[in-house]
């Protein structure tokens, strides 16, 4: 993406900023003039992304964060305001699949995570904590700062799994469905404050989280066959949607769900 001015003067927090969609969104926001505070639990990768942005002429800083920790959110929002005087954009991207990290390859389309009767309460709670509670805590923390700034944009990354079901991983579906409807509720509540809240629903995107599945040729083939445009999405595809919703071009867009899935859910 070429440099632009769509976010000049704006300050953004991007969670999950160390890799994949989060890292690309942080880069794109900075490329369009935003001052970016990116957060992640992976400090080494996060600092590397922030340094890359700064070395390219952008403005970025990194902070280690567990999005499930409410106190960390107060610290992050305060840091953004103290460093740059305001907060305009929050992009909640941090998320987990809930798959067993020891599985380095997905064996079939039905093993994208445990089936419902095999899913433990611990697994359920962890997925919901990161994917849903983290979004709630971030939104709650950002609202007062955005009110002080005269408005803002909150972008919550859900998934096509928040719209449709599948053979496995009910916790992931439930968490992403929660993000979808939570975003609509927040949009209605804070529209009078000129705070817009929208969700983005990626399809099969090539990221570190999806590579265990895509490493299996059969899984990759079936997913591509289910995608009318015939390719996996890239982090840049999703970052472009985040850029639009963060910009003033989307000033009349709130409570919406932006599906970026190569046509899969229309098929």
Whereabouts are the PLM-identified features?
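Short C-terminal tail/terminal secondary-structure segment
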Residues: 2-4, 164, 207, 229, ...
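Substrate-binding pocket helix/loop in short-chain dehydrogenase/reductase
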Residues: 101-116, 120-125, 223
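Alpha-helical segment proximal to the catalytic Tyr-Lys
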Residues: 144, 188-189, 251
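Canonical Rossmann dinucleotide-binding motif of NAD(H)/NADP(H)-dependent dehydrogenases/reductases
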Residues: 5-37, 186
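Active-site helix of classical SDR
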Residues: 139, 175, 183
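Residue(s) in the substrate-gating loop at a strand-loop-helix junction
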Residues: 159
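Short, small/polar-rich loop/turn modules that mediate ligand/substrate recognition or access, typified
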Residues: 191, 196, 253-255
């Amino acid at each position: 993406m070429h440099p632009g001015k769509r976010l000049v003067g704006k300050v953004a927090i991007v969670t999950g900023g160390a890799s994949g969609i989060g890292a690309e969104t942080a880069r794109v926001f900075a490329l369009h003039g935003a001052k970016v505070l990116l957060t992640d639990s992976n400090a080494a990768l996060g600092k590397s992304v922030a340094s890359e942005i700064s070395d390219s002429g952008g403005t970025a800083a990194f902070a280690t964060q567990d999005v499930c920790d409410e106190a960390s959110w107060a610290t992050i929002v305060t840091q953004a305001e103290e460093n740059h005087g305001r907060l305009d954009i929050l992009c909640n991207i941090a998320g987990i699949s809930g798959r067993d990290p020891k599985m380095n390859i997905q064996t079939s389309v039905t093993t994208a995570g445990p089936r419902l009767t095999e899913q433990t309460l611990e697994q359920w709670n962890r997925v919901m904590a990161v994917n849903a509670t983290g979004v709630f805590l971030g939104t709650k923390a950002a609202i007062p700062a955005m009110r002080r700034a005269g408005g803002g944009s909150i972008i919550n990354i859900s998934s096509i799994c928040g719209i449709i079901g599948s053979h496995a991983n009910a916790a992931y579906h439930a968490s992403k469905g929660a993000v979808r409807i939570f975003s609509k509720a927040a949009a209605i509540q804070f529209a009078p404050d000129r705070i817009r809240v929208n969700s983005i629903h990626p399809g099969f995107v090539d990221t570190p989280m999806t590579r265990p599945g895509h490493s299996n040729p059969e899984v990759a083939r079936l997913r591509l066959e289910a995608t009318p445009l015939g390719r996996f999405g890239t982090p840049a595809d999703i970052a472009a949607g985040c850029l639009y919703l963060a910009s003033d071009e989307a000033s009349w867009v709130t409570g919406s769900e932006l599906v970026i899935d190569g046509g899969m859910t229309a098929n």
